[in-house]
């Protein structure tokens, strides 16, 4: 993918595109991983507490 120019230097455009694609893929993988972990979380709610005090039942 990376091509050498006649003077032996890397083609800067190809190098930047390759690095950019790798960064995009890394961000995509982290995003997918985070989303999968979020969907695996089981959300629960606490049951309502019974109030045994008569002062609030008016």
Curated annotation (Swiss-Prot):
It comes from the Bacteria. Keywords: Cell membrane, Membrane, Transmembrane, Transmembrane helix. It is found in: Cell membrane. It is a single-pass membrane protein. Its main location: membrane. One of its GO terms (cellular component) is plasma membrane. The chain crosses the membrane at residues 12-32. InterPro entries: YtzI-like. NCBIfam families: small_YtzI. This is Uncharacterized membrane protein YtzI. It comes from Bacillus subtilis (strain 168).
């Amino acid at each position: 993918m990376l091509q050498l120019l006649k003077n032996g230097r890397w083609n800067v455009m190809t190098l930047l595109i390759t690095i950019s694609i790798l960064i995009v893929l890394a961000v995509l993988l982290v995003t997918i991983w985070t989303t999968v972990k979020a969907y695996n979380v089981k959300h629960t709610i606490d049951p309502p507490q019974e109030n045994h005090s008569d002062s609030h039942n008016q």
